[in-house]
A protein has these predicted regions:
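Extracytoplasmic
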Residues: 64, 173-174, 378-552
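Membrane-interface alpha helices of multi-pass inner-membrane proteins
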Residues: 121-125, 157-172, 177-183, 202-203, ...
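Hydrophobic/aromatic-rich transmembrane helices and adjacent perimembrane loops
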Residues: 176, 311, 317-354, 359-373
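Transmembrane-helix signature of polytopic, membrane-embedded enzymes
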Residues: 10, 101-123, 139, 155, ...
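Extracytoplasmic catalytic/substrate-binding loops of multi-pass membrane glycan-assembly enzymes
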Residues: 31-46, 59-71, 81-84, 217, ...
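Membrane-lumen/periplasm interface segments of specific transmembrane helices
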Residues: 194-256, 382-389
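Aromatic- and kink-enriched transmembrane "portal" helix at the membrane-lumen/periplasm boundary
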Residues: 30-33, 69, 83, 87, ...
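Membrane-interface transmembrane helices that cradle and orient dolichyl/undecaprenyl
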Residues: 106-107, 141-159, 167, 187-191, ...
């Protein structure tokens, strides 16, 4: 019996191996970096809460489509609840994204595919491995797009459309991009292929129906649409266009303050954000024009990639922060490599004299993709040496876990805090804090983590919930978001009144952004704390409060 030869050509293996090595190099560091951000803590707490019966949107405020937390919860149920498991899920989403980019770009050659993949990874790597909904959805969208475009057989097309639907289930703002992939393919397909595409898309969107049955249509609509689009927006929106003299994002401002003046020549850090914003918009428009006038191979494929990039831009328009620019730029950078490498290869092939293709064969043309990659990443690093250059270099060159890496271990949960003397001090402080809370509570008691000033709910230490698995979050507001937790009618005051212990900090009281986050909200939650709770101890950063035994204790 004859079997088909399934050996992978060495050139294809090499084009996959190079990006894989680029992923492996910073992997140990990424798995061990601090997990103390509100965003990652929220993923950990919401996903682990699903296993305890607390559902996103119904029992916990959650601002995204629920796909990523359901996936992380599934991983927790199989492999145990840990930061490493959550980050391995995040790694899986990133590998899916890189595979999708590679397969999309391989139509223009394996070298182009490898370089486009490297461009995406270089832009995205500084964000780490958080199983963040946007990255998860983008990975599914990239994989779905390439399977829809390549899916000559019915099964591949159906799987691709299903992945596009799942991308929306992970991040609902990707719906326009997913439709821009599936609808043109549907309109140009045969009746049989249309049926497969339609079936696949419905299958990918079907988890929405299951989630709605569990949480109810109202809770689902409020969580995915009303809260993030209407209630939250005024408190998270940043000025458009970005101010080149002021980093509007709070953590970018804090980074400017902590690091001091830049050691790199060129634009100031705030101006770098503004420059990246304008560059992203310009690149998006130019890519659309290039795709429209494309004379090379696979014009429809490049057009789809450019159109998807344009559909991602609203993510930046709502909040032009460094992270949002990178989320969208990770896709755009890859398309730029393709758009530069293909015509550049043709130009190199036509060089006269000793550089001609007749003398060197096709080897000269193979230089085009690396040159395109160098042009894209080099241009970004020159334009934004701090936000792109420094963070990307640090992601690939910083040491992995060593003796100075600090972690907190409590109740079977391990939380990486960071590295260095400062991280050790923070870890020790958190350790003392959770030990105190344990001494004051019993399993099943209700705990709340938030700011001292509850009229301004801009950020919180959600990772503390993760370290206290025997306690139940007292409020559906795990994250502290302006316009949500501090709005009248949010239910936060009633939640606090029923809490058994509060963990409050003033370290985010200096939060300042050019939006409604600086405007005080409902005073009722703060009044509940003032009237009913007494300070019983804590640390320099966090105070622990429990219900007063007697009103006179105040």
């Amino acid at each position: 019996m004859d079997f088909p030869d399934r050996r992978v050509p060495w050139s294809e293996a090499l084009s996959l191996l190079v990006p894989l090595v680029a992923v492996i190099v910073p992997l140990a560091r990424m798995l061990g970096t601090g997990a103390t951000t509100m965003e990652e803590g929220n993923v950990l707490v919401v996903a682990s809460g699903i296993l305890d019966g607390r559902l996103p949107h119904a029992d916990v405020s959650y601002l995204y489509a629920p796909g990523s937390v359901w996936t992380v919860a599934g991983a927790f149920s199989v492999f145990g609840t840990s930061v490493v498991v959550e980050r391995l899920v995040g790694l899986g989403y990133r590998l899916l994204l890189l595979w999708g980019i590679h397969r999309l770009a391989r139509r223009w050659g394996l070298s182009t595919a490898a370089c486009a993949t490297l461009a995406t990874w270089a832009v995205l790597a500084p964000f780490g491995l958080i199983a963040y909904p946007w990255v998860a959805g983008l990975g599914l969208l990239a994989a779905g797009t390439t399977l829809v475009l390549d899916g000559e057989d019915r099964r591949t097309a159906a799987v691709g459309a299903s992945l596009c639907g799942l991308a929306v289930f992970h991040q609902i703002v990707l719906a326009p991009a997913a439709l821009l992939v599936v609808v043109p393919a549907f309109l140009s397909a045969t009746d049989e292929r249309r049926a497969r595409l339609g079936t696949g898309l419905v299958a990918g969107l079907f988890p929405f129906l299951l989630h709605m049955v569990l949480v109810g249509p109202r809770a689902m609509f409020e969580g995915m649409v009303l809260d993030p689009v209407v209630r939250l927006r005024a408190g998270r929106r940043l000025p458009l266009p970005p101010d080149p003299n002021d980093s509007g994002d709070f953590f970018a401002r804090l980074d400017d303050l902590v690091r001091g003046p830049s050691r790199f020549p060129g634009l100031d850090r705030a101006a770098q954000v503004a420059a990246l914003f304008w560059l992203l918009l310009a690149a998006t428009v130019i890519l659309l024009v290039v795709a429209w006038r494309w004379r090379g191979s696979a014009r429809s494929r490049l057009t789809t990639m450019a159109v998807v990039g344009a559909a991602l831009v609203p993510m930046v328009l709502q909040r032009p922060s460094p992270n949002h620019l990178k989320f969208v730029g990770a896709w755009t950078a890859a398309v730029c490599v393709v758009a530069i490498a293909e015509p550049l290869g043709g130009l190199l092939g036509r060089l006269p004299g000793r550089f001609s293709v007749k003398r060197l064969g096709r080897s000269v043309r193979h230089l085009a993709p690396p040159m395109a990659l160098a042009a894209v990443l080099g241009g970004l690093a020159l334009l934004a040496p701090h936000h792109i250059g420094r963070f990307t270099v640090d992601a690939f060159t910083d040491r992995p876990l060593d003796g100075s890496s600090a972690t907190v271990v409590h109740d079977g949960r391990t939380l990486p805090v960071g590295r260095g003397p400062g991280a050790k001090a923070v870890a020790d402080e958190i350790d003392r804090l959770v030990d105190l809370v344990d001494a004051l509570t019993r399993p099943g008691d209700r705990v709340f983590v938030g700011p001292v000033d509850l009229t301004r709910t801009n950020y919180s230490d959600t990772s503390l919930y993760f370290l206290l698995p025997d306690l139940v979050p007292a409020s559906r507001h795990i994250e502290m978001n302006p316009g949500l937790a501090n709005r009248p009618g949010s239910g936060l005051a009633a939640d606090l009144a029923a809490a058994d212990v509060l963990i409050l900090t003033d370290r985010f009281d200096g939060w300042s952004e050019p939006n409604a986050s600086v405007v005080p909200g409902d005073p009722a939650p703060a009044a509940v704390v003032a009237d009913r709770f007494c300070d019983v101890g804590g640390t320099a950063t966090w105070r622990v409060l429990t219900p007063c035994a007697d009103p006179g204790d105040r």
